[in-house]
From Swiss-Prot:
Cofactor: FMN
Keyword Flavoprotein: yes
Gene it is expressed from: Dus3l
Region Disordered, annotated ranges: 1-21, 41-63, 85-105
Record: residues binding FMN: 298-300, 352, 422, 452, 484-486, 507-508
Residues where Phosphoserine is found: 263-264
UniProt keyword Transmembrane helix, yes or no: no
Native source organism of the sequence: Mus musculus (Mouse)
Cross-link (Glycyl lysine isopeptide (Lys-Gly) (interchain with G-Cter in SUMO2)): 403
Protein name stated in the entry: tRNA-dihydrouridine(47) synthase [NAD(P)(+)]-like
Length: 637
């Protein structure tokens, strides 16, 4: 069944008639029209609960703007809008590539110098050249009002590191403006494990100055270029590249050169272990035994640490960080290293790397192997976006077998943890490649492969091909293969497990309903209430403030990721409203009125209504606030 986009308003069905093909079967007493849906939401607005704010719609291309809005902008009638829609031969879908990019720092122009937040305060290293405010009185005069009486950081950790810049500062500032500390809570938190895998400042400087030695990576790359690599399939010939062709010139150099890999020019001290001089054999590596476990997919943008904490709470067994670009990690970019952070609740955790060159991928793998704590490293061979594909990464590696083999062998040669691969069925819709690559991946040393049952061309315009995944699971044996695609209920999970896969990966299903993991483990449908869903969002904002901070930048960054998640959550249809549970992932919800106002508000697919929900949790948005979701649904017809 084809899956296409439907993003307007609160759904795509404009009538109350019988269920159509591709439309979620909602009970007749709840179905409504587009006009009644928005009249209900606008009529029941609580006075003063939310102010009207621009949502960024005018900055979007006109073809999309017609679909996003109610059809009443600037006083134009519905007939006029429909005539304009007929002039568009094909409606826009996919990503909002031309959306405005507003950083959280934009809303915090008068920032206080960080030196004032140190305890005790330290002199500013920049002096008169500092671009931040040094006048505390002036800062407090211009600072917006607090967003609430409680500070999550102060209550959780006993001390808020943002002091007077916190948007909830009233909860922990003394009568003289001093930052209060709860010594007992601080002492208790000191005994608990903290978030791991941060980037050390000293290491960041070494990376930026290219002073990091990649001895094991150089040795692994030399082995790849000097010895012929065996081919697993006789019909396939792997073309060997010369060392010059095999290198990416814009990457880091090693200290001392590659001519003397046996000895490092950097003096070392301390105990010498076997792992320092003897490379682990594949049979000696740590095993990755996750068969039968629920695997949360590495989700770009939405798969952040606060969201993973939510999914862990509902029963996810395995988590993986968002896709990290290896060249950005080698350059010491803080934003990229933030994707590798691991919360203590993530007991089985991995990171996903994306790259197109064996040298940069191997060096990055060695760097992560000795600096962060993970249970496995995953190579992204499934990313379909043009920015990655045209550079030879993501799905493009499936057509670059020589480079793909060098990357897998090189990365696997420097890791002490298992190596996994996430891939698609292929690049083109009618040309499947996975069944040919899986035996090779098994012999290259890959511990586990996750297969998304769609090609790059298909994106989400087709249902996942689970019969093909079943075929690939047999070909890959004894290497475990996880299946991914269209899991939105425990029935879907049960059917997927019957194909012979070792386990299932959940992606969009977790975005629509993170309690899906509980449903699968308890084998039931959870008719969750709107108040329970709001509590989940409240917990997400608390986790977000812990992770990104409680100052203006942290609050707005938390709001942004909350809104991105709401662009998926709005597609969930409550179980009690369905005629025939469960909801299918390729069925779009029609316009419906929920069992209470909040349930109806959560069903709206307008950015303005998502902002209203965010204001319930994070207070009013700053002046000039703009938001457009990164992803638009193209999975409905």
């Amino acid at each position: 069944m084809a899956e296409t986009a439907a993003e307007s308003g609160g759904g795509g069905d404009s009538g109350v008639g019988a269920c159509e093909r591709g439309v979620a079967p909602i009970k007749a007493q709840y179905r409504t029209t587009k006009e009644r849906f928005h009249e209900y939401l606008d009529g029941d607005k609580q006075e003063g609960a939310c102010q009207e704010v621009p949502t960024g719609d005018p900055a979007e291309p006109g073809a999309k703007r017609i679909r996003l809005e109610d059809g009443q902008e600037n006083g134009k009638t519905e007939v006029a809008i429909e005539s304009r829609e007929r002039q568009v031969p094909k409606r826009a879908r996919g990503q909002n590539k031309s959306r405005p990019h507003v950083k959280p720092a934009h809303y915090d122009k008068d920032r206080l110098c960080p030196s004032f937040l140190q305890e005790p305060a330290t002199p500013c290293a920049f002096g008169d050249r500092c671009r931040f405010l040094h006048d505390v009185g002036r800062y407090l005069e211009t600072k917006p009002a607090d967003l609430g009486p409680r500070c999550v950081l102060f209550e959780t950790f006993g001390r808020c590191p943002f002091s007077m810049t916190c948007r909830f500062a009233g909860a922990h500032l003394g009568p003289e403006g001093q930052n209060l500390v709860q010594e007992e809570v601080v002492a208790r938190c000191a005994q608990l494990p903290s978030v791991r895998n941060g980037l050390d400042r000293a290491l960041q400087q070494q990376l930026r100055k290219r002073q990091v030695c990649f001895e094991r990576a150089e040795q692994a790359l030399n082995r790849l270029t000097q010895s012929p690599m065996p081919t697993v399939v006789p019909e396939t010939t792997v073309a060997m590249a010369t060392p010059k062709q095999n290198s990416c010139h814009a990457q880091l150099d090693t200290v001392g050169g590659a001519g003397t890999p046996q000895s490092s020019p950097v003096p070392t001290c301390g105990p010498l272990t076997d792992e320092d001089v003897i490379r682990l054999r594949p049979c000696e590596k740590k095993r990755l035994d996750i068969s039968g476990k629920l695997y949360l997919a590495p989700l770009t943008t939405c798969g952040n640490l606060p969201f993973r904490r939510i999914c862990k709470r509902f029963g996810a067994d395995v988590t993986c960080g968002e896709m990290a670009v290896c060249t950005n990690l080698l350059q010491g970019q803080m934003s990229e290293w933030a994707l590798l952070k691991r919360h203590p609740c993530e007991d089985i955790f991995g990171v996903q790397l994306e790259g197109a060159f064996p040298d940069t991928m191997t060096k990055c793998a060695e760097l992560l192997n000795r600096t962060i704590d993970v249970d496995f490293v995953d190579i992204n061979v499934g990313c379909p976006i043009d920015l990655v594909y045209k550079k030879g990464g993501g799905c493009a590696l499936m057509n670059r077998s020589a480079k793909f083999q060098q990357i897998v062998r090189g990365v696997n040669g420097v890791l002490d943890v298992p190596l996994t691969v996430k891939m698609r069925t292929g690049v083109q819709e009618r040309v499947s490649l996975a069944h040919r690559l899986l035996p090779e991946l098994r012999d290259w040393g890959v511990a586990l492969v996750t297969l998304h049952g769609r090609s790059r061309e298909q994106r989400y315009t087709r249902l996942a091909d689970w019969p093909y995944i079943e075929q690939c699971a047999k070909v890959a044996s004894p290497m475990p293969l996880f299946g991914n695609g269209d899991i939105l209920s425990f029935e879907d999970a049960n059917c997927a497990m019957q194909t012979g896969v070792a386990g299932i990966m959940v992606a969009r299903g977790a975005l629509l309903k993170p309690w899906l993991f509980t449903e699968i483990k308890e084998q039931r449908h959870w008719d969750i209430s709107s108040s329970e869903r709001l509590d989940i969002l409240r917990d997400f904002t608390h986790y977000g403030l812990e992770h990104w901070g409680s100052d203006t930048q942290g609050v707005e960054r938390t709001r942004r990721f909350l809104l991105e998640w709401l662009s998926f959550l709005c597609r969930y249809v409550p179980v009690g409203l369905l005629e025939r549970p469960p909801q299918r992932i390729n069925e779009r919800p029609p316009y419906y009125l929920g069992r209470d106002y909040l349930e109806t508000l959560m069903a709206s697919q307008q950015a303005a209504d998502w902002i209203r929900i965010s204001e319930m949790l994070l207070g009013p948005v700053p002046p000039g606030f703009v938001f457009l979701p990164k992803h638009k649904a193209n999975a409905y017809k």
